[in-house]
Amino acid sequence: MFLNNEIKNNIFTALCVLFGLAGVGFLLIIICSLIYKGILGLSPGIFTLPTAFGGLANAILGQIILVFMASVFGLFIGSFAGIYISEYSKNKAVKNGLICVIEILLSTPSIIVGVFIYAIFVSTFGSYSGIAGSLALGFIMLCVVAKTFFEALGSVDPKLKEASYALGASKRQVIMSVMMANAKPALITGVILGVARIAGESAPLLFTNANNDFFSFDIFSSLPSLSVSIYEFSLSSDEALRNAAWSGALLLLIMVLGANIITKIIFLKRK
């Protein structure tokens, strides 16, 4: 017996709702568990003591430094790469090749990037450093930013470009004042996704920056890292350190979510 279109549509809708609720449900379970266990592990020492004494104060500062340096590198190189692919690469084979490379790099495990930077940078200079760690994170971010830029710029209505050129605007003016202005929401979202992607990475930092259990602002040596400290604390047999790992994960979530919200608010005000 064949099902009519209405029954098929109802079945399909029910399956979509079911799997959608399942996905959201699992996400809510993870977030609620993180909030519950993270709050239980919070204490004044988390924000005042270094990781050597069971706190995360140095790791929080170190993570901010690493993510900031990586974001500068990733945003600068990634944005220019995306603009070049979208607007300056006229050879179709070269353009498709660059897009393919970016897609492959996006799907590459982050630990591979860490091993690559270790082989090129760390082994050459003979020591772990914050610069090496930020390069690894920045390399991951630039792929996200580059893809976002060439896709966002490619989605701008070609008639806007043609009208701008007809008015005598230069290529730089068209890209900066017309195309990027119209693609701004997508570009901002891409940058936020890039920062969120690297904020919780620990695997590449294990090979490039390692970790530091004390306060340090020397980017030429190992910087403390919140994501690596969470990983190390979670493997500890000390229950207090495992609780601190949950608190660190909660703080990392709040940092990423806070950066996202602040960016959205700034964008809405300017809009």
Predicted regions and their residues:
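A structural signal for multi-pass alpha-helical bundles of membrane permease subunits
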Residues: 27-39, 117-124
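Hydrophobic positions within alpha-helical transmembrane segments of bacterial inner-membrane proteins
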Residues: 25, 63, 67, 71-83, ...
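Membrane-cytosol interface at the C-terminal ends of specific transmembrane alpha-helices
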Residues: 72, 79-92, 96, 129-179, ...
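Alpha-helical transmembrane segments of multi-pass membrane proteins
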Residues: 16, 58-66, 70, 102-106, ...
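Generic hydrophobic transmembrane alpha-helix motif, especially the helices
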Residues: 103-138
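C-terminal transmembrane helix and the adjacent membrane-cytosol boundary/short C-terminal tail
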Residues: 6-12, 85, 150-154, 158, ...
